[in-house]
């Protein structure tokens, strides 16, 4: 039996509607419709990535996010915007595009500073029901990819609401 390959977003799609997931992802009978909200989210993510990575000026309608982003840019350590990580079925690191990957994901911003790391996931939607499970998955992959990291502070940054949902993870707590 073939190993099921997954990401957090594909798992959410499956949980939301298994039949739709099967029709779109497995059978490929339909293409997932791109909504205005999805386009907006992609555009904002790209603007935030470019600003945090190399200081590309933000468009006027995104300049209100700059104070939050300046804090991230000033965080000590090696910055990895849009950092791709993957694990194989043995839960060891592999290349994101490896044929052997089992799970993979992209961290919006990863900052590694010695034994401590920061994981930031930009969110453009509502902060009413935050779901930090994606942070937990990214933390597990970060521990696997960065063996010196012992402690991770993670957060969902709801940029449109100037809201931050924080999480903390310790390597010792990983089973």
Describe the predicted segments one by one.
Residues 1-5, 173-175:
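Short, intrinsically disordered, charge-biased short linear motifs at domain edges
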